[in-house]
């Protein structure tokens, strides 16, 4: 698998490939069923250990979920944000490079599935799996960057697309995955060789469809996809699983290395501070853990628990609570306020979550006729329920689009950037790199 991961470098947007005579050639990897299965397994390992860290860490620092406890320049630059976050910062280069690599591996898998002779059920499994990983990688990129390349180019000169186009492509990939699995159910061969017991591919595709439909403003479709997850007869919770050799990447950055720690109260201030008795606080956060660096804000920190407390703790690929909150927001934005409050209260009153993310609070007592108030309560619950899922950066921009982010460094606002500048390594190697966003 390691060789496959190394060889995948030739599929990134900027050309960083180095010849290694011990690596299988691209033709060997993509030309056999066994090679495709090995690549699929390699994608899972790379994404869950390497790319997922970047999906969670950079947005988590930008939106005050995580506090910085060392003097490493890259994460301190993220904590300050504003104009002090330069294109050469590793804090934004790492997400860019890692997600492009994961996306390139998925593109190679999809290409191979269309050329290698496979049974219909195996082909649908390989393509659905590849489409899912490409959509996840693209979605994470467009939540951090104003534009992103939909397809990697071998010469490094990938073309960029705007947010709406990228989201539409994510949706198209996932719709194709959903429809292929419906017309040609995934084969037992693919399930037993590539998938793992904690993975329901169909539910996961629908969960990400619900997410990206919501971001694109396709509210009815988001509700339908969320219902497909919530009403699925299979109780499997799709999880990234870890062992001693492939360790939980957020545990590794918090508990193990203490470079970062969760901010107390999830970094929320004022009206967004969790209510007394909210069970999600004690699920995710432990005892007081000191303070962040003064230059990074000096915020109060807590011990890491939840899905990141041990080196082998599994991380959910999506949460049931996200599906409920997606429905709540979609109803609210369509002015179906009573339906929105019903879904919101399902989250607030939840005490039987399959992964123990239980607020166990009473029903909301706010103004049920105010769309603005309902949306604010949904935002607050997304910040708590979906802690360290990589979603808060996107959520902050969607719920508070008129918030003016200062150009000066800031460690107290709910976000200190709207989008990241494009990494210098991309700009120096790709003439198609757009101008940086203003903030």
Where in this protein do the model-derived segments appear?
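Aromatic-residue-lined binding/catalytic grooves and analogous aromatic/hydrophobic interfacial grooves
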Residues: 14-15, 171-184, 202-241
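Membrane-proximal, proline-rich intrinsically disordered regions
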Residues: 14-62, 226, 355, 401-439
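Conserved, well-structured interaction surfaces
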Residues: 37, 73-145, 155, 159-164, ...
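Hydrophobic-face positions in mid-chain alpha helices that act as interaction patches
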Residues: 75-79, 217-324, 351-364, 371, ...
């Amino acid at each position: 698998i390691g060789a496959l991961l190394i060889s995948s470098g030739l599929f990134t947007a900027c050309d960083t490939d180095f010849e290694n005579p011990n690596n299988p050639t691209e033709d060997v990897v993509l030309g056999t069923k066994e090679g495709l299965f090995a690549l699929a397994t390699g994608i899972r390992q790379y994404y869950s250990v390497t790319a997922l860290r970047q999906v969670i860490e950079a947005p988590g620092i930008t939106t005050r979920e995580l506090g910085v406890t060392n003097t490493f320049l890259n994460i301190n630059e993220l904590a300050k944000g504003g104009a002090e976050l330069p294109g050469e910062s590793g804090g934004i280069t790492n997400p860019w490079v890692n997600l492009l690599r994961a996306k390139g591996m998925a593109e190679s898998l999809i290409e191979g599935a269309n050329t290698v002779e496979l049974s219909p059920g195996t082909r649908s499994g390989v393509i659905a799996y590849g489409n899912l990983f490409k959509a996840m990688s693209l979605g994470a990129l467009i939540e951090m960057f104003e534009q992103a390349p939909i397809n990697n180019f071998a010469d490094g000169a990938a073309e960029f697309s705007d947010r709406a186009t990228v989201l539409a492509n994510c949706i198209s990939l996932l719709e194709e995955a959903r429809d292929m699995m419906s017309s040609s159910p995934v084969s037992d061969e693919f399930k037993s060789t590539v998938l793992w017991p904690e993975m329901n591919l169909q539910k996961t595709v629908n969960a990400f469809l619900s997410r990206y439909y919501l971001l694109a403003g396709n509210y009815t479709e988001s509700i339908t996809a969320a219902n497909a997850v919530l009403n699925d007869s299979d109780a499997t919770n799709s999880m990234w699983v870890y062992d001693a050799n492939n360790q939980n990447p957020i545990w590794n950055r918090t508990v193990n290395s203490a470079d970062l720690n969760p901010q107390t109260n999830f970094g929320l201030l004022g009206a967004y501070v969790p209510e007394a008795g909210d069970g999600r606080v004690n699920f995710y956060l432990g005892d007081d853990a000191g303070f962040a660096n003064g230059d990074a804000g000096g915020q109060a920190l807590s011990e890491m628990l939840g899905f990141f407390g041990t080196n082998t703790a599994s991380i959910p690929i999506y949460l049931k609570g996200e599906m409920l909150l997606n429905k709540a927001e979609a109803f609210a934005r369509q002015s179906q306020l009573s339906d929105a409050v019903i879904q919101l209260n399902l989250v607030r009153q939840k005490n039987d979550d399959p992964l123990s993310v239980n607020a166990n609070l009473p029903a909301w007592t706010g103004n049920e006729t105010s769309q603005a108030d309902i949306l604010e309560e949904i935002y607050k619950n997304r910040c708590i329920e979906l802690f360290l899922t990589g979603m808060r950066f996107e959520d902050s921009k969607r719920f508070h689009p008129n918030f003016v982010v200062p150009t000066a460094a800031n460690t107290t606002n709910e976000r200190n950037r709207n989008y990241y500048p494009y990494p210098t390594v991309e700009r120096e190697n790709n003439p198609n790199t757009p101008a940086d966003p203003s903030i």
